[in-house]
Amino acid sequence: LVDIALAAWVASRMGKAKRNLWYSPHLKTDYALSDQDSLPGFDDWCVLATPGHTDRDLSVMHLPSKRIYIGDLLVKVKDRFIPPIPVNYPEQYRASILKVQALRPASLMLAHGREVMLTEANYAHVLTVAPRKPFTIWTPAKNKLQRLLLRKKG
């Protein structure tokens, strides 16, 4: 349910119309893929392990064009590239951003947006704002509550 609520929130922030979202929480694996594997049936696409948002995130790179579909590794909100919510594995997330940056892709394709080209400044910004501790949809509310409780004690 959190994923569905989050998808609705992202869609509203992007000005998209509301629509019914529902999918099974139990997914069936068609192919087990690992870092550097070719996509079955698409030899010119390479799998990249890019965990951090979740522990199993994958990106895929079209080798001839050096274009990478990164899924939810980044989102663009108000003309800024930022980490997604949640970032469950912050160290892995930062390593994934550095991995993609090191590949010097021609462009990145976002799950929630269009094809974009990041500058070195964009990558630097993402790494600066990337959380250092796990960050979920509940983290801001928890932090605000802690600040309120500490203020009342003091």
Model segments located where?
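Intrinsic structural disorder
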Residues: 1, 26, 100, 105-109, ...
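Short, charged, surface-exposed secondary-structure boundary motifs
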Residues: 1, 78-83, 142-143
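Short N-terminal signal/transit or membrane-insertion segments
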Residues: 1-5, 36-42, 137-142, 154
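Short, hinge-like loop/turn segments at secondary-structure boundaries
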Residues: 1-5, 87, 126-128
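Active-site HxH/HxHxD metal-binding segment of metal-dependent hydrolases
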Residues: 1-31, 132
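Metallo-beta-lactamase
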Residues: 21-24, 38-40, 44-121, 125
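Extended recognition/assembly regions associated with phosphoester-bond processing machinery
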Residues: 28, 33-37, 46, 146-154
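Binuclear metal-ion centers of metallo-dependent hydrolases, dominated by the metallo-beta-lactamase
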Residues: 116-154
